[in-house]
Regions:
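Enzymes that bind and transform nitrogen-containing heteroaromatic metabolites
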Residues: 1-147
Length: 147
């Protein structure tokens, strides 16, 4: 997250996080809370009317490729997507994703989990940039789409 200063969120992640992160002021999550609360957030949704209930939030409800191009052409650091599997899938399908970082946890999840990739998704080839194991067994895998 140190390389990013702008956050893209989908509707569900925004709705959930907007009710939580503004309330975190201390403890082990305080650093992340300050970063996410202070950073510009762009919320991609076709159903929300407003995102004013979380500071520094802007609604994107129109042409996603044009909005992403405008964000990329602006000044600042990287743009990151937090959570939001539906948004990640849409960005990948539209070739709007420059890098994909997956956290691979050493567990097998059963029902109730939303899949990142749809069964009918178009084949997208990815190039492994790095794979970093953590002390908890999580692997942080970074990929770039091949174009």
């Amino acid at each position: 997250m140190e390389t990013a200063d702008t956050i893209l969120l989908g509707r569900a992640t925004f709705t959930e996080w907007a009710g939580y992160w503004p309330t975190v002021t201390d403890g082990e999550d305080a650093g992340f809370a300050k970063w996410i609360n202070d950073s510009p957030k762009y919320v991609v949704s076709s159903t929300l009317d407003s995102v004013e209930d979380w500071a520094n939030s802007t609604l994107i409800n129109g042409d996603l490729p044009a909005a992403i191009e405008e964000l990329k052409s602006g000044e600042g650091k990287d743009i990151t997507v937090a959570g939001s599997p539906t948004l990640v899938r849409s960005l990948l399908e539209q070739d709007l994703l420059d890098e994909l970082v997956l956290l691979i946890h050493p567990v097998v999840a059963g029902e109730g989990r939303k899949k990142l990739f749809a069964d009918d998704a178009t084949l997208k080839k990815l190039e492994l940039v790095s794979a970093q194991p953590t002390s908890s067994g999580v692997i942080i895998a970074t990929y770039r789409p091949t174009r």
